[in-house]
């Protein structure tokens, strides 16, 4: 049975973060990948966001992301020639999107300026700096996330979420799936 370990991360004095690692429950602790991982992550992201609006930020391999979204009729917004913002699609489309692009590093945001429309400054910085652009911006949001699903990793940068709250949010949506959610000792 896969494990979803959720714990606070120490990324420095100015960054509050929660790390989520989806790994096999064995001595090797290899990342869980493939359809099962996409099914789990597609439930975790919206659950972490709760009632806050959620978007995905892609800042590499833009042509492939655009083509996938067009083929699957997933709405998106090209914010710069090198970045695409995807408002969180319905569950099955989100799962397909995460399955297709789990080998890429991309981002997600919830709350904050999303409700007001867009955050052009951050979106330009994402195109230029990738996930590093979230560091100065995350306090404006409910969370900013770095999705490294190939490595079984999701890092939530947030001043509003802590590990126990993330566990409380994700446990119910993962019931019925073969995964154990825990705070490592």
Feature map (PLM): residue ranges:
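Structured alpha/beta or helical-core interaction and ligand-binding surfaces enriched in interleaved
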Residues: 1-185
């Amino acid at each position: 049975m896969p494990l979803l370990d959720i714990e606070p991360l120490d990324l420095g004095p100015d960054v509050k973060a929660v790390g989520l690692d989806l790994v096999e429950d064995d001595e090797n602790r290899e990342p869980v990948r493939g359809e099962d991982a996409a099914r789990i992550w597609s439930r975790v992201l919206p659950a972490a966001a709760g009632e806050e609006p959620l978007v995905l930020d892609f800042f590499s391999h833009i042509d492939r992301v655009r083509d996938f979204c067009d083929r699957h009729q997933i709405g998106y917004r090209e914010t710069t020639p090198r970045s695409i913002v995807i408002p969180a699609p319905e569950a099955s489309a989100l799962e397909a999107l995460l399955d297709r692009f789990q080998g890429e590093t991309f981002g997600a945001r919830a709350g904050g300026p999303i409700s007001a429309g867009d955050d052009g400054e951050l979106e330009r910085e994402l195109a230029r700096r990738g996930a590093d652009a979230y560091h100065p911006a995350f306090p404006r949001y409910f969370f900013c996330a770095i999705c490294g699903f190939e490595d079984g990793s999701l890092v939530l940068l947030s001043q509003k979420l802590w590990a126990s709250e993330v566990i409380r949010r994700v446990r119910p949506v993962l019931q019925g799936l073969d995964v154990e959610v825990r705070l490592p000792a």
